[in-house]
Structure formats: C-alpha cells, structure tokens
Amino acid sequence: MLPPMYLSAPETALPGTGVDNDEVIARVRKAFRGKADEWIPIEQSIRYVFDRCNSKVRYLETDTTLSPGEFAAQAAAACLAANGVAATDLDLLVYGGIARDAFEPATAAEVAGRLGARPLHVLDVTCACAGLIEALHVVAGYFALHDEIRTALVCAGEITRDRVTYDIQSLEDVAVDVAGLTLGNAAAAFLVTREPLPGGGARIVGMTHKTLSENWALCRAPVDGHFESKSKELFALGIHVPPEIRRLLDRAGWSAEDVAHYAFHQPSEASVEKVLAELGARPQAGVFTHSLFGNTATTSWVLALDHRLKQGAVHNGDKIVLASAAAGFTIVSAAAVWEDA
C-alpha cells in the first residue's frame, strides 16, 4: 500500500547560456572533415530532426568546474527556501540524475553536504531519464519501512559536457548522435513529505514502472564515451507508453480526460503529442517545454510541471500525471492530485 506522500512545487535551475539550433549546427560543421557536398545531407537531416522535435534552444553549462552535485544543490537549496524547510529537517535525500562526476561517494552525499543536511539517509538512484520518478518509488519504500523518516528531498543536476559529440561525419553518425544535439542542461529538486506542505503540493495516489529490458542497447551513455541513441527504434517503442499510462489511470480510478496536466519527459514535442492523442487526453492538458529547454534528461518532466505551475494554471483538485520513457527501455509514471495549502 502506498504511504501518504506529498510532492512539493519543484525548483529548477538553468545555465546562463542558451544555444540555438544554428549554433549547434555550426559546431557540427566546424568538426566536419568531409567534402562540401557531403555536408548538405547531414545538415538537412539534423534540421529535420530539430523540426520534428520542435527543438529551438537548449541551455548548456560552460563552467567546467561545476559538478552535477553542486548544480543539483543549487536547485535543492532553492526548493528548501521556497518551502520553508531547513536542510537539517531532511531525513532522506535521493539523487536521481544521470550525470555524475565520480563513482563514489553517492552524488546525494555531495548534495547533502553542500546543503548542510545531517545526519540523514542519502543514496543515488540511476534509471536513465526515469530517475526522478523512480526516486519517488524509493521514497515510498523508505516511508513504508521507516516511520521516523518524514521529509525527503529528491534532486538531479544534469550536465552533458563532452558526453554530447559534434563529431558527425556521415548520415550513419546522424542516426545515433543527433538526439544528443537536442539535449539541454538543468537541475531540479522537490520535497516529498508525509503531511501536506504549507505552500501546497501534489498528493501522490499511484505509481507504475515497467522495463522492456530486451531493448537495453538502443540508447547508451557509456562511462568512457559519448551519448548515442538509435532514436528511430527508440521512438517506435513509444507504442508501449499509452498502455502504461492507462494502467496508472485505472489504478487511480481516472479517465484520460479527467487529467488536467500531463507533465511528461520531453524528448520531442511530436512524441508527447502522439501519446496524448492515443490516450484521448484533453489537448490543453499537455505540457510542452522541449522548445524552451530541449531534452533535459531526468529533469524534463519537472521543468514541465514547474512551467505549468508558474503559469498559474494548476488549481486545487487538479489531477496530474507525471511520466517518463527512458533508455532501458523503461516507462515510469505517477498520478497526483494538487492540493492548495
């Protein structure tokens, strides 16, 4: 049984540098070593993907000394301040991001140390772009097992740096490397508590997880290489997403039209539109932020929810679905009801 869980309004952080499509293509052109006529189809293919995804700008961190943990701590500190919670009030801190600059210690320990949170439980959850929603499952487990744990913080700091390659020399390279050109950097954090928060929050009413592990090799970010994604094959697996969302809705006792806000992972605008159409969701319920931030990995759905909240469009009693499809191939989701203070 799911323990009582309330998700705070999130806080997010972006690098100061926005990079548009023309700048990204200029970087690829600079690295290109082929003939001029060989460049034309490569550029056309990249622009086609950008148009299909509705990629326009992504924010890329230029400070090479900023660690993912420090980046996450920026969003975490803002989240604590916004919700009037002291770092010393935290009982559990989970880092759910992909980016990390060390195998040990846990990046969560760095975030906690930078915040001055102690003593507490800290751990990392790694589940590709599904990490932050999967972290909710972990928090639910801790809440169920440990009565003394009352307040958790979940965070991520996604920085790509040299994990994205601009060394694209052929159409074959485009096929596996172009997804990396849509990636942006962002940090995000939110609180999970047993009791309602003074500033309001989302009461979690259900969660799901499914991994189709036979597809594990389609998308990888190796420890000693750059991000590669067989995007055509990966997006084809999107047919498995609507059934998982329906399973979540059935658990919550909702219909697709009952949901006021779908805050999904944002690999492309077209993929989100396709899922929402298949579900029969209200058109205005979809949140689209890929054009604003790019694909920011684990933090994408958080930026989408934050964007909708800052628009003042979330009201008491609104039903919300959070979801991410990720490398693995993993599909995770959570259903929540927004409750004002």
Residues covered by each model-derived region:
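Condensing-enzyme catalytic core mediating Claisen C-C bond formation in acyl metabolism
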Residues: 1-65, 166-236, 325, 337-341
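Buried hydrophobic positions in well-ordered alpha/beta secondary-structure cores of metabolic enzymes
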Residues: 7, 49, 79, 90-93, ...
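Short beta-strand segments
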Residues: 8-11, 96, 126, 152-158, ...
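Acidic-glycine-rich active-site phosphate/pyrophosphate-binding loop
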Residues: 46-49, 102-116, 156-169, 216-217, ...
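Active-site pocket-shaping loop/turn-to-helix segments
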Residues: 56-74, 123-130, 179-181, 222-243, ...
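Claisen-condensing/thiolase-fold acyl-transfer catalytic domains that form or cleave C-C bonds
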Residues: 73, 99-101, 110-113, 117-118, ...
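Phosphate/pyrophosphate-binding loops at sites that engage ATP/ADP/AMP, CoA/4′-phosphopantetheine
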Residues: 75-91, 243-260, 279, 308, ...
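Flexible, glycine-rich active-site loops centered on histidine and acidic residues
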Residues: 144-182
